[in-house]
From Swiss-Prot:
Induction: Not induced by red (R) light, or abrasion in dark-grown seedlings.
Encoding gene per record: CYP74A3
Sites where the protein binds substrate: F297, N298, K304, P365, V366, E367, F368
EC numbers, comma separated: 4.2.1.92
Cofactors (names): heme
Record pathway: Lipid metabolism; oxylipin biosynthesis
Domain of life: Eukaryota
Annotated tissue distribution: Not expressed in dark-grown seedlings.
Function: Involved in the biosynthesis of jasmonic acid, a growth regulator that is implicated also as a signaling molecule in plant defense. Converts 13-hydroperoxylinolenic acid to 12,13-epoxylinolenic acid.
Catalyzed reaction equations: (13S)-hydroperoxy-(9Z,11E,15Z)-octadecatrienoate = (9Z,13S,15Z)-12,13-epoxyoctadeca-9,11,15-trienoate + H2O
Pfam families found in the cross-reference section: p450 (PF00067)
GO molecular function, a single term: oxidoreductase activity, acting on paired donors, with incorporation or reduction of molecular oxygen
Protein name (Swiss-Prot/TrEMBL): Allene oxide synthase 3
InterPro entries linked to this entry: Cyt_P450, Cyt_P450_E_grp-IV, Cyt_P450_sf
Length: 500
């Protein structure tokens, strides 16, 4: 028996319906899985899971598993009540969907640096720093132009300033090696002075502000970030009450910030003078608050997190990698040369460069990216597509995106030569998936995008750290204890360069 004739109109409608369920790339469009639960109570429960009962990575992995491997999910993000008015986000947990957050035409990043809450502007002299401005804001380009010009003009000071900081830091490590020596504390102490020397020159804050300069800087950072900090206060119920329930009052760090600001007003006077002559349209006091933020939050805060992670991975890799790095460094800059390691020299060290990029892939200094959808859009993961509505908060957890097994072989492992052409696990084309700087490593920051204006300086400091370490030492050993934000690294032995 012949089948009934098909009405051409019905067939066309069916075909149109099928097409409407596919994304432009041909992926099936699905409803975003997950949910937000009961207002107040579910965000509170999720906050406890995130900080204490599961930890950040397991918080996301467990929800991915719960929803059949979907990597675009609806979840609550801390801090939740009472600091955050709306904890609801659409989480992007794979390399493909995450890239939406790097497209400034698709996301609005005004006031999203820290996520679902905005620190009080009283912490920033009443101003909104560059990092909290959307790329479309006219002030963004004006301020970023000054910051990028500063970073470019001071790049030739980075290597000598770092060399001095490294020597002082590791002289202190060696002096304390009768017992275990914690790297993190020394790193904080010397990297604040390095940051200011590299960016502005002049007397370091440890001399002008005094020994309390680092303490004041850390207190100012803590008052911004305490809603998303954890395992700082024990027991955890007390931490919940003190750090995650209400915003700490800015007046408690007003005096310390005033001392730091006074230091930068003098140290950065030439930069501020030049900006005024260039008629940037940004008042001097506002630009000063921005320079304080760039130096302490972006630069010093980044080095505080990033360098312990580099040392962690080197410590775990052991003597075999150490020997390869020492050979490469000393072949490029012999230990007897007085000029020291330059940026041009580390550019000729492919393994050193790869180690730094791999550390940035495994542990990006800023783990999160946030942005509001500028319009209704379709977000694609590897396997499906999802409709997002205008105004929804998009969130990316970068450690999952940059360890995506569909992009990287041995994605969860530290592979030292991953970015060496012809290396064991790949080569340079993978760099576009290293996105720690709020943009691909293959792209440059500009006035019109949200990529880190100090991207090149951060990478340079990482390379100098590795190169200086293996110019001075053959190998080292250290204990590593994982902790939120950064690992605690304790040196137990250092073996001086045999040819030194």
């Amino acid at each position: 028996m012949a089948p009934p004739p098909v009405n051409s109109g019905d067939a066309a409608a069916a075909a149109t319906g099928e097409k409407s369920k596919l994304s432009p790339s041909g992926l099936p469009i699905r409803e975003i899985p997950g949910g937000y639960g009961v207002p107040f109570f579910s965000p509170l429960r999720d906050r406890l899971d995130y900080f204490y009962f599961q930890g950040a990575e397991e918080y996301f992995r467990s929800r991915v598993a719960r929803h059949g491997g979907a990597t675009v999910l609806r979840v609550n993000m801390p801090p939740g009540p009472f600091i955050s008015g709306n904890p609801r986000v659409v989480a992007l947990l794979d390399a493909r969907s995450f890239r939406v957050l790097l497209d400034d035409s698709m996301v609005d990043k005004a006031d999203t640096l820290d996520g679902t809450y905005m620190p009080s502007r009283a912490l920033f002299g009443g101003h909104r720093p560059l990092a909290f401005l959307d790329a479309a804001d006219p002030r963004h380009a004006k301020i970023k132009r000054v910051v990028m010009s500063l970073a470019a003009a001071r790049m030739h000071h980075v290597a000598p300033a770092f060399r001095a900081a490294f020597a002082a830091m590791f002289d202190a490590v060696e002096a304390g090696l009768g017992a275990a020596v914690e790297f993190n504390k020394l790193n904080m102490r010397y990297m604040l002075d390095f940051t200011c020397a590299a960016l502005f020159g002049g007397e370091p804050p440890s001399k002008v502000v005094g020994d309390g300069a680092v303490t004041k800087a850390m207190a100012w950072l803590a008052f911004q970030l305490h809603p998303i900090a954890s395992k700082v206060v024990k027991p955890w119920p007390l931490e919940e009450l003190l750090l995650h329930t209400f915003s700490l009052p800015p007046f408690l760090v007003r005096r310390g910030y005033a001392d730091l600001k006074a230091y930068f007003a003098d140290a950065a006077a030439a930069v501020l003078d030049d900006a005024e002559k260039s008629h940037t349209g940004i008042p001097r006091d506002e630009l000063l608050d921005n320079l304080v933020f760039v130096a302490i939050f972006n630069a010093f805060g980044g080095f505080k997190i990033f360098l312990p992670h580099i040392v962690k991975w080197l410590a775990r890799a052991g003597p075999e990698l150490h020997a390869k790095l020492a050979t490469e460094v000393r072949a490029t800059v012999p230990t007897g040369e007085d000029d020291g390691i330059t940026l041009a020299a580390v550019e000729r060290m492919p393994l050193v460069k790869s180690v730094v990029w791999e550390a940035l892939r495994m542990n990006p200094p800023v783990e999160f990216q946030y942005g509001h959808a500028r319009r209704d859009m379709v977000v694609e993961s590897h396997d499906a597509a999802y409709e997002v509505r205008k105004g929804e908060m998009l969130f990316g957890y970068q450690p999952l995106a940059t360890r995506d097994e569909k992009v990287f072989d041995r994605a969860g492992e530290f592979v030292a030569d991953r970015f060496v052409a012809g290396g064991a696990a790949g080569d340079r084309p993978l760099l576009e998936h290293v996105v720690w700087s709020n943009g691909p490593e293959t792209r440059a920051p500009s006035e019109g995008n949200k990529q880190c204006p100090g991207k090149d300086m951060v990478v340079a400091v990482g390379r100098l750290m590795v190169a200086e370490l293996f110019r001075r030492y053959d190998t080292f050993a250290a204990d590593v204890v994982e902790a939120p934000v950064e690992p605690v690294v304790t040196f137990t032995s250092l073996t001086r360069a045999s040819s030194g």
